[in-house]
Swiss-Prot record:
Catalytic activity: a quinone + NADH + 5 H(+)(in) = a quinol + NAD(+) + 4 H(+)(out)
Topology of the protein relative to the lipid bilayer: Peripheral membrane protein
Sorted UniProt keywords: Cell membrane, Membrane, NAD, Quinone, Translocase, Transport, Ubiquinone
Function in brief: NDH-1 shuttles electrons from NADH, via FMN and iron-sulfur (Fe-S) centers, to quinones in the respiratory chain. The immediate electron acceptor for the enzyme in this species is believed to be ubiquinone. Couples the redox reaction to proton translocation (for every two electrons transferred, four hydrogen ions are translocated across the cytoplasmic membrane), and thus conserves the redox energy in a proton gradient.
Primary location group: membrane
Organism of this sequence: Roseiflexus sp. (strain RS-1)
Keyword Coiled coil: no
One GO location term (cellular component): plasma membrane
Protein name (Swiss-Prot/TrEMBL): NADH-quinone oxidoreductase subunit D 1
Family annotation (PANTHER family): NADH DEHYDROGENASE [UBIQUINONE] IRON-SULFUR PROTEIN 2, MITOCHONDRIAL, NADH-UBIQUINONE OXIDOREDUCTASE 49 KDA SUBUNIT
Disulphide bond pairs: none
GO MF terms, alphabetically ordered: NAD binding; NADH:ubiquinone reductase (non-electrogenic) activity; quinone binding
Length: 374
């Protein structure tokens, strides 16, 4: 009888397929994975402690550097938490601008994630460049509105930094003309490539019960068949006024996770159409006038208490928990990072698969190590 011996190998922390400084201790029997332990912390930057020694508004640019693909979404979550803590209202126009920016961010994120999946499976560069092409157009819009392409620091407590420039909406409409064909093109790349199908179908399956037990959220959870989306479960901003669907999968494998992301881009496109149509009729300005000078002439001092706010970021449920002692700095500042939580069931998803599948399964979770390690 053939006897085999288990072997422990390390993948990362310096590896081209780990999407950052991430280490996996993999126990293998031949090429088959027996166990996998994720090791975090190589990119820890003390984000929460920095926020606790900074004023509330000084923490806003730090959030850009959590998930640096989704700076607008990070800004939004912190803004909601502080507004809840301090009882700050947001003008209707600012709410619609916020939703517009976050949904553009969702398209940007998912386009990059699908491109990276194909890249990781050996479709070197070309499909990734399709996603990056659309991403660049969205970054141009962010630069037009905020002055920055990635670290936007655009949101403010009570609104946004400034109103949209006159040329923003015309350029956005021009971008949106090409998005439906881009979504179809990406879906065709997934559905009509036999090698890709064999590498993704029934690979990295995450059953819904396991997903819930790990508190997984976002596209990873919805791919497992659970229609949970914070925009519907606990509507914030103006999402309760907008019409969109929550796509779900049935198997919870790599294939489902990326089909979900493509369909979510289509739903973000629907939301953008509604926002553009309603934006001219919105009331109020880009920021609550009472908050216009916060950080310039005076500091924000919320009353003692605590608040938790969450949003549906492109990666999943992003939450900020704040405790105020009445000073200009938070007594406690805690981030619920979806990349970190979604990464915890990686061992369950990889067990029984081949070593070559680890890269594909990890890529399908869609993580950014800046958010994982904080």
């Amino acid at each position: 009888m053939l006897q085999t011996q288990e072997l422990q190998i390390n993948i990362g922390p310096q590896h081209p397929s780990t999407h950052g400084v991430f280490r996996m201790i993999v126990t293998v029997d031949g090429e088959t994975i027996v166990d996998l332990k994720p090791v975090f912390g190589y990119l820890h930057r003390n984000h929460e402690q920095l926020a606790e020694v900074s004023t509330y508004i000084q923490s806003m640019p730090y959030t850009d550097r959590l998930d640096y693909f989704n700076s607008m979404a990070n800004n939004h979550a912190l803004a909601l938490a502080v507004e809840k803590l301090a009882g700050i209202s947001v003008p209707q126009r600012a709410e619609y601008i916020r939703v517009l920016m976050v949904e553009l961010t969702r398209i940007l994120n998912h386009a990059s994630a699908v491109g990276f999946l194909l890249n990781d499976m050996g479709a070197w560069q070309t499909p990734l460049m399709f996603g990056m092409r659309e991403r660049e157009k969205i970054l141009d819009l962010f630069e037009m509105a905020s002055g920055a392409r990635m670290m936007c620091n655009y949101f403010r407590f009570g609104g946004v930094w400034r109103d949209l420039p006159p040329e923003f909406i015309p350029q956005l409409k021009e971008l949106m003309q090409g998005l439906p064909s881009f979504f179809d093109e990406f879906e065709r790349l997934l559905k009509e490539n036999e090698i890709l199908l064999s590498r993704t179908i029934n690979v990295g399956v995450l059953p819904k019960e396991v997903a819930v037990s790990y508190s997984v959220t976002g596209p990873v959870l919805r791919a497992s068949g659970i229609p949970y989306d914070v925009r519907r479960a606990e509507p914030y901003s103006v999402y309760d006024e907008l019409d969109f669907d929550i796509p779900i999968g049935s198997v919870g494998d790599v294939y489902d996770r990326f089909l979900i992301r493509i369909e979510e881009m289509r739903q973000s496109y629907r939301i953008l159409q509604q926002v553009i149509e309603r934006l001219p009729d919105t009331t109020g300005g880009h920021i609550n006038p009472a908050m216009a000078n916060i950080g310039k002439q005076k500091a924000l001092r919320p009353p003692p208490g605590d608040a938790y706010a969450r949003i549906e970021s492109p990666k999943g449920e992003l939450g900020f928990y704040l405790v105020s002692d009445g000073s200009e700095r938070p007594y406690r500042y805690k981030v619920r990072a979806p990349s970190f939580i979604n990464l915890t069931p990686l061992g369950d998803m990889c067990r029984g698969h081949k070593v070559a599948d680890v890269v594909v399964i990890l890529g399908s979770i869609d993580i950014v190590m800046g958010e994982v390690d904080k």
